[in-house]
Amino acid sequence: MMVSLWIVSLIKKDASIVDIFWGLGFVMVGWAAWKISDADSQRGTVLAVLTTLWGVRLGGYLWWRNHGKGEDFRYQAMRKHYGSKFALKSLFIVFGLQGALMWVVSLPVQLGQMTNNAKIGVVGVIGIVVWATGFLFESVGDIASHSVLHGTLKSRCHPSF
């Protein structure tokens, strides 16, 4: 997936697409692990669905925030620094690194898919509550960040944004 995104970034001359696909990559990993595990379990399905909700929310937000704004300043700086070597460097430094990080960060989802016929249980319910809390905090944080940077709170001083 990351190599395909890298090729698209070369065509578009915009490495920022890697950010938009960060969350969606987890969706792909979650469902691939679900399919590969061949485990028909409640837990596996719930993990894949929750990963999908989180990944689509994150990818959608990043698309909405960045769409039409051109390449992110970080990648522009890399492009300027590496010059003609940027294409190959971006494969490893940007796309390869994010692919490796995605694999590591998604290990709990991948490992959670490995048990056949796993029921949700009390620990699973606690996990769903923790997930929902995190999902809510991320969503509210994104809305607050946007309000501070572009909306009603733009004139207030919020150094963390």
Residues covered by each model-derived region:
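Membrane-anchoring alpha-helices and their flanking helix-loop junctions
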Residues: 1-159
